[in-house]
Amino acid sequence: MYMAQKAKKKSKLRHAEYYDMQKTFDSLYADSKSGEVFGHLMDIISAPSNIKLAFRNIKGNDGSHTAGTDGRTIESLAVMPEDKFVKLIQKQFRRYEPKAVKRVEIPKPNGKMRPLGIPCIIDRIVQQCILQVMEPICEAKFYEHSYGFRPCRSAENAISYAYGLAQRNKLHYVVDVDVKGFFDNVDHRKLLKQIWTLGIRDTKLIQIIKAMLKAPIEMPDGETVLLSKGTPQGGILSPLLANIVLNELDWWIASQWDEMVRHMKHPCKMTYYPNGAEKKCNSYTALKKSNLKEMRIVRYADDFKIFCRTKEDAEKTYYAVKDWLWKRLKLEVSDEKSKVTNLRKRD
């Protein structure tokens, strides 16, 4: 699985270089890192090279052969002359109206069903064009320990970091928070504000994303519904939008401890014992004795765990996070599925 993901990412990099877009993406990342804002992204998004790259990336996905509500697949676009195809997609950007998203349900390992939204193939191309340009801008602002659906990151990386927190940092109490129906409950207005805050300020692009979020959903029984919240799982842009929503949580948790360690008045160079454990300097020790709770977050999409030093800290953290998620993001936490676990305690 991991090797397949690496091969797929390398393939996308080769495609970007082939269509001469990689330098543009690198520049977007660097500008975002330095605090630039972006008011004219549609010129890049609708550029022929970016559209051709989007087609190439979509074509490599198994899902490209699955039809949306219009019955079309990637094959129907592949037979078009290249210049005609590019003009078709550019026309979508001028006045974008997404077609209905096809809702299907697939079984989960626990026997329940997971709803997936399948956009029409042209809408998938449009989303891919946007993803390619938004991703480097967002990557420059994302927290380093979120691992889901990000370039050059994997579940294995998340597990490795979590293992280190428990073994080297001795953070043995884990807060496991379950958000009720995360993808179905994303607040559209809040999400659009978060996109703006990340420096993406092209109003035309914001309007297109807003239209995507409000695309009608064709249910399995044939009924068409309009949703006022949520971003359907299955959409190409949905994983990035999910990371944008929860990036604010990542940095809020980090501000409680991680960033304090990083920006101490007298920071010290970390050194290590032969077994890999960190040697803590005096400044770090003083920070531990303060009223701040030591906590670290590890997140993979909407699945996240917060590592704490004591049971009391973990329980306080759970209620603080639950309160924060509701007040800031309008997301509810399931008390039944959430828990605090002592990793040293064997079943």
What are these regions (language model features)?
Residues 35-38, 48, 133, 228-233:
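Charged structural interfaces that engage phosphate-rich ligands
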Residues 104-112, 134, 225:
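Residues forming anionic-ligand binding surfaces in small-molecule and nucleic-acid pockets
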Residues 4, 20, 37, 117, ...:
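Duplex nucleic acid-engaging cores and interfaces of nucleic-acid transaction enzymes
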